[in-house]
């Protein structure tokens, strides 16, 4: 089973999920024979095997979301029209529903002097703060960073673990200034959620200028200052 729009030569494995509602089934056989496609006990299509021994079938009407147990039979081209026993079923799931919108990411500072959560609108001296959150296990979280007034850019991704948690840290320093982080969730079928609400932080790792004593005021007494 090949999802439309996928990389040529790639195929869905049994039990996998796709967002493609018109997946293509293909195979090989005896030229002139007819391949019958079944979902459970219901015939949903057929295709004739061409002169090179190949066949393919794509639904003309999009399939609704759900689980499909696909099997094949072959009908001989002879006048008897004998039909083979069905093949071993292959189960696929069609899922076009996007995941729920993720919650706003949490930002954590791990550089002294002040460590811990960085709230929306606050500053941090951590050039590689940790972002974390929760989601559906095995969904992929994509992190977007809008620097200043620029456009949001995808800067990293991480898979939600079996406990529903995720955590991501930039591989390199993210740079001084304002960063607004959002996140999306992508499920196994490739459906991507709308972005989360954003959290804006300001990275400031520059120490203040060294203070200079410019004057000492005091009453003079023999040339000294009391």
Locate the predicted segments by residue:
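Flexible, low-complexity linkers/stalks enriched in Thr/Pro that connect modular domains
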Residues: 1-6, 78, 83-113, 187-192, ...
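Short strand-edge motifs at loop-to-beta-strand transitions and within beta-strands
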Residues: 53-57, 164-168
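Short, acidic Ser/Thr/Gly-rich low-complexity loop/linker segments typical of extracellular
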Residues: 44-52, 153-162
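Surface-exposed, short loops/turns at beta-strand junctions within beta-sandwich domains
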Residues: 60-69, 171-178
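Hydrophobic/tyrosine-rich beta-strand signature of extracellular beta-sandwich/beta-rich modules
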Residues: 72-74, 183
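Short proline/glycine-enriched turn/loop motifs at strand-loop junctions of beta-rich domains
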Residues: 28-33, 134-140
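Structural beta-strand segments of beta-rich domains
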Residues: 21-25, 127-131, 225-226
């Amino acid at each position: 089973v090949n999802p439309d729009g996928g990389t040529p030569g790639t195929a869905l494995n049994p039990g996998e999920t796709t967002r493609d509602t018109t997946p293509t089934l293909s195979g090989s056989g005896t030229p002139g024979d007819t391949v019958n496609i079944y979902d459970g006990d219901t015939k949903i299509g057929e295709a004739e095997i061409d002169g090179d021994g190949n066949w393919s079938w794509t639904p003309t009407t999009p399939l609704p979301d759900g689980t499909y147990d696909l099997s094949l039979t072959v009908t001989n081209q002879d006048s008897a029209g004998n039909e083979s026993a069905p093949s071993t079923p292959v189960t696929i799931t069609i899922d076009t529903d996007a995941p729920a919108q993720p919650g706003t990411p949490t930002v954590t500072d791990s550089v002294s002097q002040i460590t811990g959560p960085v709230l929306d609108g606050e500053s941090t001296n951590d050039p590689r703060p940790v972002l974390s959150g929760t989601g559906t296990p095995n969904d992929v979280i994509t992190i977007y960073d809008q620097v200043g007034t620029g456009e949001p850019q995808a800067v990293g991704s991480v898979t939600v673990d079996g406990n529903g948690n995720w955590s991501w840290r930039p591989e390199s320093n993210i740079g001084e200034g304002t960063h607004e982080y959002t996140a999306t969730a992508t499920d196994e079928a490739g459906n991507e959620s709308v972005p989360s609400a954003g959290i804006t932080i300001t990275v400031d790792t520059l120490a203040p200028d060294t203070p200079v004593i410019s004057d000492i005021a005091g009453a003079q007494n023999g040339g000294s200052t009391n």
